[in-house]
Design a protein with these regions (language model features):
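Active-site neighborhoods and metal-handling regions in enzymes and metal-associated proteins
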Residues: 1-249
Length: 249
């Protein structure tokens, strides 16, 4: 809970800094300093992964701009332009627990399509969250997300999913953002996991860039993502990463 609140506070803090002309490395540095100095937390992505020939993730946040689906690496050469859509993904470790959350921002005025994709993607996340209660199944979550995305003529990325989270960053269960109702793991009180749909304006296919992390849409059309960390409660759910701006839950 404390880790979730800490992570959501980073997203609340960084919004005013997302402006045309800022680099994604500058956003990374602002978030890193805030996480470490203000919150006394650890940025979980920094040096995460590696092994199997993959380099560890070199930065403290993920910055995924426009057609980048997820895991964009902050760079001093990536300057935001007016109209750019950017997902900022924050994971912090507080007292051994992880809080993981992301949201979409716009540098200046986003395009009509980017704003619509972002809005529908956030709605997809909320539709998924609304399924969460003891006795529901993971397929119910995936189905709710997929149905809302596809009914708006968007597509669901299948290579990445939500995940169990607590003392481990990525744990079981795998929370797919597509599926059939009544299938998959049954939810039980006390389970904690993320719901983090990645929705594409075009086709769902993606590819990984040579940096081994950055995922982009194959057709170069826009992608959006929103994410919360939540827990199954006796009568539903509690979102650990809810922000004050949200009227949900």
């Amino acid at each position: 809970r404390a880790a979730g609140r800490a992570a959501s506070s980073v997203l609340e803090m960084i919004g005013e800094h997302v402006q045309p002309g800022v680099t994604t490395e500058e956003l990374n540095q602002i978030c890193h300093d805030y996480i470490v100095d203000k919150l006394d937390c650890i940025p979980a992505p920094l040096n995460y992964g590696g092994g199997g020939g993959q380099m560890p993730f070199p930065k403290s946040i993920c910055t995924s701009v426009n057609h980048v689906v997820c895991h964009g690496i902050p760079s001093s050469s990536k300057k935001l332009k007016n109209g750019d859509a950017i997902n900022i993904d924050i994971t912090v470790i507080k007292d051994g627990y992880h809080g993981d959350t992301s949201k979409m921002f716009f540098a200046g005025e986003g395009s009509v399509m980017a704003k619509r994709l972002s809005k529908i993607t956030q709605e997809c996340m909320y539709r998924g969250i609304e399924q969460v209660r003891p006795g529901a199944r993971l397929g119910d979550i995936g189905y709710a997300i997929q149905r809302h995305a596809e009914s708006n003529h968007f597509s669901v990325v299948r290579e990445f999913c939500g995940h169990g989270i607590a003392k481990v960053f990525h744990d079981d269960p795998q929370v797919l953002h597509y599926g059939r109702p009544g299938t998959g793991v049954m939810l039980e009180e006390g389970m904690s996991f993320t719901i983090e749909p990645m929705i594409n304006a075009g086709k769902r296919q993606i590819k990984i860039l040579p940096d081994q992390w950055t995922a982009v849409t194959k057709d170069h059309k826009l992608s959006a993502q929103w994410e919360h960390t939540l827990m199954v409660t006796a009568d539903g759910f509690e979102i650990f990463t809810l922000r004050t701006e949200e009227n949900f839950g």
